[in-house]
Amino acid sequence: MSLFSLWVMAFGLSMDAFAVSICKGLAMEKFQWCGALKAGLYFGLFQAVMPLIGFLLGVQFSEYITDYDHWVAFFLLALIGVNMLRESLSDEDDEDSCSNDFNFKTMMTLGFATSIDALAVGVTFAFLSVDIYSSVVTIGLITAALSIIGVKSGHFLGKKIKTKAEILGGLILIGLGVKILMEHTLFG
């Protein structure tokens, strides 16, 4: 996977955390850097650890599905992307994600919930030529930075950004899935 593709994937994966961070910022009466840094730490750490776990699981099963790995990568990324689009267009809103509470339990729950997609992407990494350690660091750092920016911008800009971020993230992941499939079927 090229560095550009990795950055695009990291950006796409970080959109759930970014959207929740915007909600956190919206709930703040007064902006607090401590809350923004906590969001960056929790979301960045979860987004880094989950693909590593997914990668390790994928490596365990890669010998059984090597002939179909590009299809697995495509379907996982497309499924995640479509789910992100569906969630962004629904009227449902998660009250916990939009509270101004940055306690351990809340942030652990949100960190896990926003990184499930990263676990599935980690499985796809097992089938691609990916330096897993630099990949998870890149994903974690980009997510941390965007989460901090999300809290800050949510505090100042309002609700309009949240849905657009989720739509963009979903489209990016679907696009990457199509790219992987095309590379292996048309050009591979």
From Swiss-Prot:
GO MF annotation terms: manganese ion transmembrane transporter activity
Superkingdom: Bacteria
Pfam families the record matches: Mntp (PF02659)
InterPro entries per UniProt: Mntp/YtaF (IPR003810), Put_MntP (IPR022929)
One GO cellular component term noted in the UniProt record for this chain: plasma membrane
Membrane topology qualifier: Multi-pass membrane protein
Main location, first listed in the record: membrane
Compartmental location: Cell inner membrane
Residue spans crossing the bilayer: 3-23, 39-59, 65-85, 110-130, 131-151, 167-187
Keywords assigned by UniProt, alphabetized: Cell inner membrane, Cell membrane, Ion transport, Manganese, Membrane, Transmembrane, Transmembrane helix, Transport
Classification via PANTHER family: MANGANESE EFFLUX PUMP MNTP-RELATED
Family: Belongs to the MntP (TC 9.B.29) family.
Record's function text: Probably functions as a manganese efflux pump.
Name used for this protein in its record: Putative manganese efflux pump MntP
